Amino acid sequence: MMFNKQIFTILILSLSLALAGSGCISEGAEDNVAQEITVDEFSNIRENPVTPWNPEPSAPVIDPTAYIDPQASVIGEVTIGANVMVSPMASIRSDEGMPIFVGDRSNVQDGVVLHALETINEEGEPIEDNIVEVDGKEYAVYIGNNVSLAHQSQVHGPAAVGDDTFIGMQAFVFKSKVGNNCVLEPRSAAIGVTIPDGRYIPAGMVVTSQAEADKLPEVTDDYAYSHTNEAVVYVNVHLAEGYKETS
């Protein structure tokens, strides 16, 4: 049987009218299509919203050599240094706690979350317990230079991670300071502690007391992951350069 285009057109028109009359198609749909929408409203790099604790929107400051994947989000008072690689689905969201800082040559890999507890109350006063100080400056989250934040890891402020440190896959840092040249192996966690320089947390271990943190093993030359971060930083710096050239 041959298909009758005229009958098909009539059927489609009838169905459209029926749906519109039943309310299944919103009258505002046409308005949405016609509405002029700026790119900024849907940008993955944008200002934080105005809130009771923060009446001023702030836009991220990103070094021109850094690469932010279109599927990553960078929001609010965020500073991103030179040659930083931010991979797909990473979220750097400075809308509650602020500011967030990511140092030179660091990498924020797929699915990583950087966020923080509220750092300013509704009276505009700082919440000291939710702030970390690094070199005389205050942050909600601080990530040093040459740091690797591996896939799906989270650093939730107040928190700071020192230079040349590797935060492994699905590792977690909260209300903590992690020193320089440290390693958090996959699925390990530092909660409410200070990890001394040059220490590592074994895979799956959750460190919640300073006594535990002070007894952590040292990163030595024969430690399995002693040079992992160096290699990961090298790769991601070149990935950032490559993606910048093709974007």
UniProtKB/Swiss-Prot annotation:
Substrate binds at R93, S94, D95, Q109, D110, N236. The active site is at E96, E118. Its cofactor is Zn(2+). The keyword Metal-binding applies. Coiled coil: none annotated. GO terms for molecular function: bicarbonate binding; carbonate dehydratase activity; cobalt ion binding; sulfate binding; zinc ion binding. It catalyses: hydrogencarbonate + H(+) = CO2 + H2O. One of its GO terms (cellular component) is extracellular region. Binds 1 Zn(2+) per subunit, at the subunit interface. It is found in: Secreted. Homotrimer. PANTHER family: CARBON DIOXIDE CONCENTRATING MECHANISM PROTEIN CCMM (PTHR43360), CARBOXYSOME ASSEMBLY PROTEIN CCMM (PTHR43360:SF1). Belongs to the gamma-class carbonic anhydrase family. This is Carbonic anhydrase. It comes from Methanosarcina thermophila (strain ATCC 43570 / DSM 1825 / OCM 12 / VKM B-1830 / TM-1).
